[in-house]
Amino acid sequence: MDLHSLALILRTAALSPIPDERKVSEQQLNQLEHTPQHLVRLLQIAVDGNCDMAVRQIASIQFKNLIAKNWSPEDCGPAVRQQQIFESDKELVRDNILVYVTQVPTLLRSQLGESLKTIIYADYPEQWPRLLDWVKYNLQNQQIYGALFVLRILSRKYEFKSDEERTPVSRIVEETFPQLLTIFNGLIQIPNPSLEIAELMKLICKIFWSSIYLELPRQLFDLNVFNAWMVLFLSVSERPVPVEGQPMDPELRKSWGWWKVKKWTVHILNRLYSRFGDPKLQSPENKPFAQMFQKNYAGRILEGHLNFLNTIRVGGYLPDRVINLLLQYLSNSISKNSMYKLLLPRLDVLLFEIVFPLMCFNDNDQKLWEEDPHEYVRKGYNIIEDLYSPRTASMDFVNELVRKRGKENLPKFVKFVVEIFLSYEKATVEEKPYRQKDGAMLAVGALCDKLKQTDPYKSQLELMLVQHIFPDFNSPVGHLRAKAAWVAGQYAHINFSDQNNFRKALHSVVSGLRDPDLPVRVDSVFALRSFVEACKDLNEIRPILPQLLDEFFKLMNEVENEDLVFTLETIVDKFGEEMAPFAFGLCQNLAAAFWRCLNTSEANDDSDDMGALAAVGCLRAISTILESVSSLPQLFVEIEPTILPIMQKMLTTDGQEVFEEVLEIASYMTFYSPSISLDIWSLWPLMVEALVDWGIDFFPNILVPMDNFISRGTAHFLTCKEPDYQQSLYNVLSTLMTDRNIEDSEIESAPKLIEVVFQNCKGQVDQWVEPYLRLTVDRLQRAETSYVKSLLIQVVANMLYYNPGLTLGVLHNTGLASKVFDLWFQMLQQKRKSGLPANFKREHDKKVCCLGLTSLLALPGGQFPDEALQRVFRATLDLLVAYKNQLAEAAKETEVDYEEEMNGLQSSDDDYDDDGSDGEMDDTEEGDEAQSVKLQKLAAQAKAFHYDDDDDDDSDDDFSDEDEFQSPIDEVDAFVFFVDAIRVMQASDAQRFQNLNQSLDFTYQAIANGIAQHAELRRVEIEKEKQKKLAAASTPVTAL
C-alpha cells in the first residue's frame, strides 16, 4: 500500500465522524499490521513535514503501539510471539529513527522517543552494535542534542541492572564520558546561556545519574576523572539560578529548564554521598574512595545545601523537589559525627526557622483547601507527592534528628512545640497562630513512635491529647479539625487511663465524617481505622455501624482514595460475620465506586492516578467482605450479579493492573458459592485466553479458580461441550508446557492443574491419560529445576493412582518407562546437606507418591514383573516411613504452636520491653553499626522460619504444608491404602506375595510390619473420627 492511501486510512480511523467508516478503517489497519514495510511506512508518514500534523500524530501513535507490542515478542505470551516484525523492517527502522527522533516537533518526539526506547532496550548491544558508534560520531560532530537524547535512553536501560547485567555500562562510560565532560565544561563557560543549554546540561546530568545509580563505573574511581566531574557539579550546584526568564506561573516555574538542571545536580551529589560516600557501607576495595569523598566533598556539599536552603528563610524561591532533596542530604548527615559537627552551629536556625515553617499550613494549602479540596486530599494522600514534598522531607529530618541525636534535640523541640500550644491557647481568636499550631500538631503526630517510647513524654501523652489536640475537633478552622483527627488516629493505640477520653475521641472522629469540609471527612476516615483497630469494646461502634457505613459510601461517592477502603476493610475484619446483613449493600457500593474510579482513571490516563489505586482498594475490600461471610454461601448467590460484570471486564486485557485482585474474587466466588453458576463459568474462557496471550505471570493466581471449577463443578466440566472445558484445558496446558521459551518457574502451576483433573475425575477421563502423560514426560525430559521435576513426577503418580494399568501401558508405549522410574527413585533418594529429603518435601508430595507407587502393587505379574515389584515395594516402604515421620513432626509443631498461642493470650498486650531508651548516638559512630547488627539478627531469625535449609542449593520449592488446600485424596489414608493393596495381592496371587516377602531383608520386613500395625491404628482412629462427625451432625443446634 502506498503512503497516500495509508495516510487516508489513518485519517479516517481517527478523525471520521461516521462510526462505520472508523470501524472499517480500524479493521484495515489491523489487517496491515503484519504486512512487510507497514511499520516503515508509518514512520515515513510520522516524519513527513508535508503531511497533516493530525495524521502524523496518528501514525506516530500507531508506530509506537506496534513496536511496543511486537518488537520483542519473547517478552509476551505465546500467541503474540507469532506476530513478529520482519527483520528487514527492523533494520530499516533502526537506521532511520535515529535521524528523525530529534528533528520532529515535540508533540511527535515523545511517541518516537518511546519507540526508540523499546528498540534500544530490546536490541542493544546484540542486534544494534553500531548504536554507540553513532552516538560518539554525533557528539564529535556537534549533533549534540540527538546524541545525548539517545545516550540518555541507552544509559537508562542499565540504571537498575544488577552487576552481571551492567557490563555494557563500562564501555558506554569509557567511550562517551570523556566527550561528555568536555561538552559539559564548555556549556558551563557560556555567558548568559539559553534554555537550550540548560536542556543539554540536564541530559548530561541524567546520563551521569543513570550510569552511577547502582554502581560507580571503574573509570570514575580514577580520582582525576572523578574530581573533574565533581568540580562541574559543585559549580552548577553553588551558582545561583538565572533570575531572568523565570516563569511567573508556579507550575511552569518548577519545571523551568534551569531549575531542572539544579534538581539533577543536587540529586547526583546526594546519590554519590548516600551510595558511595559512607566508608562503613563500602567493601574494603571501595573504602578509600568513600574516605576521600567524605574528606573532600561531603562537608562542602553540606555547606552548599545549607546556604541554598537559607534562600527560603529570607523569602526566596526554591522548587518543592529541590527543597526535598536538600533536606534528604541533611537527614543522611545526622548520624555521621563529622557531618553533624558541621551541621550543629546552624542546627537551631535550620530546625526552627526553615524546617518547622515547612511543616506548617501555608498559603498554597489554604488556596487548595478553599478552591479545590479534592486536589488537597489527593496531594495529601499521594505516595508520589510524598516523595517530592518539602513537608514530608521536613518530617523525616525531625524524625531522624530525634532518633539519632535525641538527647540534645528532642527536649528542645518538644519545648518549642509546647510553647506554640500554650501561646495558641492564650491568644485571642483574632491572634491565634493557627498555622503554627497546625505545624506543631503535625510534629506531634510525626514523632508519635518516639514519644510513645521515651520518658517522661510517654506518661504525658493522654494529657497532651486532652489539653491540646482534642479541643481542635471543634475548631472554627477546618485544617485544625482535620489535623486533630489525624493526630488522634496516630495515638489511638496508647493506653488511655480514662476510657472516656478514648470514647470521646472516637465519637469526635465519627462526627468528623459529617464535617462540612471534605479534607476533614477524609482525615477522620483515616483516623477511624486506627480507632477501630484499637477498640477493645466493639459495643462502642456496633450501635452506629449502619450510619457509619452510610457516611463511608457518601464519602466514597465524593472522593477516590484507597485509605477510605483500608478503613472499610479494617471494620469488616473486626466485625467478621456480623457484617453479613451489610455484605450485599457493601458490595453494591464498592462495585459502584470501582466503576467510578475506573472511569476516572481511564479519563485521566495518569500512571499515578489515585483513582487507579482506589479501584484496586475497592476490589480488595470486596475480597475482604467475601472472606468475612464465607460461612454463609447463600450470600454469594445474592452478591454474584453485582460483581460478575467486574470480573467479566477485568479478566481481559483491560484488567491487567488489577488481575490478581479480580482472580482472588473469582476464587472466593467459585469456592464458597453453593454451586458454580453458568454465569461464573463464563469466566473460564477469559482466564484461558489471558493465560495464553499475556497472563502467564498470573498462572499461580489463575490456578486457584480453575481448580475450584474442576473440583466443585466436576459434572459440568466433564459433560459440557459448548465450550468443551476438557479440550480447552488440554489446549492451554499443551501450549504452555511445549513452549521452549517458557521457563520452568512459569509452568509450575500446569502439573498442579493436571493433578486436579485426575484426582477429581477418577474413572471418568481415561481418554486424557495418554495425551497428558505424553505432555508430562516430554516436559520432564527438558525440565531443569528439581521442583518442576518433582511436580511432573507427581503427575505420573496421580495417573498411576487414577488407573495404574492404563498409565503403565502408556508409559511403556512412550519407551520411557524405565527412564521415568529411574529418575523418580533417584529423586526419592536424594538428600540435602542437612539430611532432609531434597525432593517431594511436603506431606502432600510424599502422599501422592505413596498412592501412585502403591497402586502398582496390586497389578498382575503380566503387567508388572516381580523385579519391578520388589523395587517399588521397597521405595514405597521408605517413603511411608518418611511420610509418617513428617506427619508426627507436624503434629508436634502444631501442639507447640497451640501452647505458645495460649501463653500469648495469657500475657498482657502491653508487655513489651520499653526502657525508654531512644537509641542515642554517642561520640562514636556505632549507632548505624549497632542497627545493622540488629537487622542482621532479625534477618537471621526470619530466615530460620523458612522450610529450606541454608545449605540447600535447590530453593525453588516455595510451597509448604501451611499452604492449606483441599484435595480428594485427603480422605484416603496412605497407610491403610498400602496395606489394602498388599492384601489384594496376597488374595489374588499368593505365590507372588510370598516371593515378594522372601525378597525382603530383615530391615524391610520390620518396616513392613511396623507400617501394617500403624495402618490398623489408623483404621481405628478413622472410625472414631467418623463416629464423632456423625454424632455432631445429629446433635440439634440450640437456638440463641
Curated annotation (Swiss-Prot):
Disruption phenotype: Early flowering and increased sensitivity to inhibition of seed germination and plant growth by exogenous ABA. The modification N-acetylmethionine is found at M1. Residues 896-929 have a biased composition (Acidic residues). It is found in: Cytoplasm; Nucleus. Residues 893-931 are annotated as: Disordered. GO terms for molecular function: small GTPase binding. SUPFAM superfamilies: ARM repeat (SSF48371). GO terms for cellular component: cytoplasm; nucleus. It holds the Pfam family IBN_N. Expressed in roots, epidermal and guard cells of leaves, stems and siliques. Functions probably in nuclear protein import, either by acting as autonomous nuclear transport receptor or as an adapter-like protein in association with other importin subunits. Involved in the regulation of the abscisic acid (ABA)-mediated pathway in response to cold or salt stress. Involved in UV-B responses by regulating accumulation of UV-absorbing pigments through mediation of MYB4 nuclear transport. Involved in trichome initiation by controlling GL1, GL2, GL3 and TTG1 transcription and may affect an upstream regulator of GL3 and disrupt complex function. Belongs to the importin beta family. This is Importin beta-like SAD2.
